[in-house]
Structures are given as structure tokens and as C-alpha cells.
Amino acid sequence: MSKTIAILAPGAMGSAVARRLNENGARVLTSLKGRSEATQKRAADAGMIGAEDEAIADADIILSIVPPGEAVALAERLAALIVKREKKPIVVDCNAVNVDTVQRIEEIIGSAQAPFVDGGIIGFPPQPGGKSPAFYMSGEYAGDVAVLRDFGLDVRIVEGPVGAASALKMSYAGIVKGLAGIGSAMVVAATKAGAADALRDELALSQPAILARLEVALPDMLPKAYRWVAEMREISGFLGADHPASQIYEGFARWFEHLAADAKGEAVDAELLKAFSTGIAQKKS
């Protein structure tokens, strides 16, 4: 039986998820009000249908897939739409937000008497013919969205309340993106001090797995750095203000903010990171 699923918004992940759902028989709606021509084309290419707010609110399931800094505002917008509907959609927050934030979002959606699921996406946007990222779901209604498996998504239920899936996402991202933060900061510092080749050679000898990861992670992170700023602050909040390590992630937020601005400007540090990554590949050949 087909389902109508609304995805807000049609970014890189949202549109790729929409394509996967559409390929497996779901009807996928999105909001295109005020969106750029490029975004509208991306949505159309993914088989998404532009819809008014009323139609969005009538979907069976709504997936919120936006930058973490926009998650609460979107929840408030959705609650204002849903509260007027007799039939309530299941709202799933799939964003990289901490436990406190997702519990706040649960309260907002709950004020509209709609069922809410805490979600966390781990993995890359699905490519045609490729595997789905993992969609971890928790909360009372998590089992109700397991139906998304029938439409091509890898849904994994976390036995726990709202907050459990987000805690998993925060912990995983804190490790994986934290390594990207540490690696990129040290590579730039080493390069500016004339030690790039020596660092690369030593990592190849003693830490080959880390070097292999940096080869991919350094160039891959640059176009995403702006999105990671708010995520690092969410991770800092997940640890808590009194946790000694929380300032590490606040520092990563500032570092990724710098890299995002650098990549858009003179790209000094961005080019150093790309050069280091290219050097890894050249050493292997």
C-alpha cells in the first residue's frame, strides 16, 4: 500500500531520500515556496511534488531533514499546520540535534497532538542502485515508521525514548566528524610549518588507517563545513556545559566556520587540505 511522505527540505540528503522513496512506490511531497531554481530542479529530478502547506499536513509521515539550526523553527511551522487537522501525520525529526533540542521539538509537535519520532541519519545520501543510509528511530511511535523499509530506507529501531536516536547520532558524529576536525586542523598547522610531507610519511608508517581516512575526509568535508558548525554546537550541548570536553566541540564549530568562510573566499587553508590529500594519493601510486 502506497504512502504519502512529505520531506522538508529538498536539500542534498532530503532529495536523495525522496528519490529512493519515489523509486519504491511512495508519493513524496515537499514545499518549494521561495526556493531557488536549482532547488526546484533538484526536487523535480528526485520525483518530489511541490505542495501547499495543507497538503504537507495531510501526509502520512513527515520527515524533517534540514540543517540543525533550522530544526526547531520547522517544528513550530509544522505544529501550526498540524494542529488544525483531524488526521495527524507522524512527524520524524531526522536532524543532527542533541537530546535537549529533540525533546523540545517533541513538545512542540506534541502541542499539535501529533505522534513524534526521534530520528538520526548515519551515512551518505543514497545513490541510485546504492545502499540507504541508516535511519535510527526511537520513541513510542518508532515502530509505526518501520513501514519506510518497504520503500527502500534502512530503518533501525533504537529501543528507548525520544532522545535515544539523537544521542546515538551525536555520539557517532562527535567521533567521526571530530576526527575530521582534529585531522584538518593539524594538517593545516603542519603544512604552514613546513612539516606536511613528514607528517604524511609518519602517518603512512604508524597510522595508515587514519591516513586513509584523511585522504577522503579532508576534501569531502570542505563543501559541508558550513553545515557542521551548528552540529558541533549541538554535540557540545549534548555533552553539557559542565563537561570538560564540551569546549572541544565549540572549538570545532569555530574551526569549521573558518573553513567554510575560507573555502568561499581566498581558499588558503582549503587548498592546503586538498594538497595534503592529493599528496597521499600520489605517494600510493
Regions found by a protein language model. Name each.
Residues A267-S285:
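Short, basic/aromatic-enriched C-terminal tail that caps enzymatic domains
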Residues M1-D58:
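NAD(P)+-binding Rossmann beta1-loop-alpha1 motif at the extreme N-terminus of oxidoreductases
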Residues L168-D269:
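Helical "substrate-binding/catalytic lid" subdomain
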Residues R27, G47-I49, I90, P115, ...:
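Conserved beta-strand segments of alpha/beta enzyme cores
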Residues A51-V92, V97:
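Rossmann-like NAD(P)-binding element
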Residues I5, V97-K177:
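Rossmann-fold dinucleotide-binding core
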